[in-house]
Every structure is written in structure tokens, then in C-alpha cells.
Amino acid sequence: MTTERTGILLLVSGPSGSGKTTLCRRLADEDEAIYSTSCTTRPSRKGERDGHDYHFLTRETFEQKVTNGEFLEYAEVHGNLYGTLKTEVLDHLAKGIDVVMDIDVQGAAQVRSCADTSIKAALVDVFVMPHTEDELLKRLT
């Protein structure tokens, strides 16, 4: 009897400068997990690729996806919308692929409150903090 493994959703949150992005990128670089690709309405920056760094959407398209309930989490930051599509995460999990999300505390709360049973069953929640307040201040300056 073979049991198919379902992926894990590793939700990594913490304050800016805590090291969460470094942790997530390292996991993805070592092929331990897929780094989730967020959607955004901000313009792409030099060197960024659509579908790799972000899914670049118009505000209208993004807002329609919000209305349709397509986001696992989303927020507006500095006038731009950012969010993670449910289908992208669920598709990877169903294939047994682990997904890592680098997310702020508010976004993590949205993911935790998701009603989808597949998301809830796969969720591993990690909060990252630097060792000391001095270390956090050093990272932010």
C-alpha cells in the first residue's frame, strides 16, 4: 500500500529584519520547498520576471480576484496590492510539494483563518525573531 504525501505549507512570519526572507530563500535554494510567488499591482523592477519574482497584475484584475475569493491572503502596502493565490498553493500541496511563504504578521493571520481544510491540514506556522533587539536594529539600519 502506497501513501501519497501531501505537501506542507510552511508559513514563516516575523517583523521586518528578523531573517524570515533569508530562511525562506535558503529552503527554496536547497530544493526543500517551493517559494510562493505573490501577486502585486506594483510595476516590475529591473530584472524582475513575471511569474518568477511576482505575478504582475493590474489593479482591476487584482481586485476582481479579491472579489472572487481567489486569494489566500492579500494586503495593500504603500498604495500597491500584494497577495498569494489559493490555487497556486493548493496545486503544489496536492502534488506533494512543500510551499514556503515569507509573510508579515497580518498576512499570516489571514492564512491561519482560511477555511480551506487542505490549507489548515498542511499548515506549519513559524514565527522568526532575531536573538536580540540590538540584532534587529542592526538588520534594519
Where are these regions (language model features)?
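Extreme N-terminal, non-catalytic leader segments
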Residues: 1-9
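P-loop (Walker A) phosphate-binding loop of NTP-binding proteins
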Residues: 13-15
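ATP-dependent small-molecule kinase phosphotransfer cores
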Residues: 38-99, 105-106
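Post-Walker A helix-loop "phosphate-sensing" segment adjacent to the P-loop in P-loop NTPases
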Residues: 28-37
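ATP-binding Walker
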Residues: 18
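Conserved phosphate-donor/acceptor-positioning beta-strand/loop module used by diverse small-molecule
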Residues: 99-105, 118-140
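The feature captures the helix immediately C-terminal to the Walker
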Residues: 24-25
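Walker A/P-loop
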Residues: 21
